[in-house]
């Protein structure tokens, strides 16, 4: 996977965390540095950790499914993308009690928003991906997106939440199709 695809993938994976961070920002009257750090570290950290775990799960089974790896990557990315698009079309509002930045709440949210990254990590095992670069980009881009989302959410509310998830879903599907086409026609 080339550098620009990793950038797009990182942005797409960060959209769930971006949407949650918008809600967090919406629920806080006054943001402090600790809010930015908590949201950025939890979401960015888990977005980087989960593909790493997924990658090691994937390489465990790589020899068994090497002949269909491109299909697996395509299916995983497409399903995750479709799930994100579906969620973006559901008219969910931000939780008015989303102003919780405690350990349990943030841990649960970080895990929930990074499950997609775990599945993407599995697909990394079948692709030509620089894992260290990928997890660095995923983590740092998610960190930055969440900090921006916290501020935007604090200023503008929930208007952008569903659009972020929709965009993320579309990007994942496009990447899945790109991987499939490259493998079927250009390998």
From Swiss-Prot:
Example of a GO MF term: manganese ion transmembrane transporter activity
Major localization class: membrane
InterPro entries named among the record's database cross-references: Mntp/YtaF (IPR003810), Put_MntP (IPR022929)
Transmembrane segments: 3-23, 35-55, 56-76, 107-127, 129-149, 166-186
Membrane-topology descriptor: Multi-pass membrane protein
Keywords: Cell inner membrane, Cell membrane, Ion transport, Manganese, Membrane, Transmembrane, Transmembrane helix, Transport
GO CC terms of this entry: plasma membrane
Localization per Swiss-Prot or TrEMBL: Cell inner membrane
A Pfam family reported for this protein in Swiss-Prot or TrEMBL: Mntp
Similarity comment: Belongs to the MntP (TC 9.B.29) family.
Biological function: Probably functions as a manganese efflux pump.
Protein name per Swiss-Prot or TrEMBL: Putative manganese efflux pump MntP
Organism: Campylobacter jejuni subsp. jejuni serotype O:2 (strain ATCC 700819 / NCTC 11168)
Gene coding for it: mntP
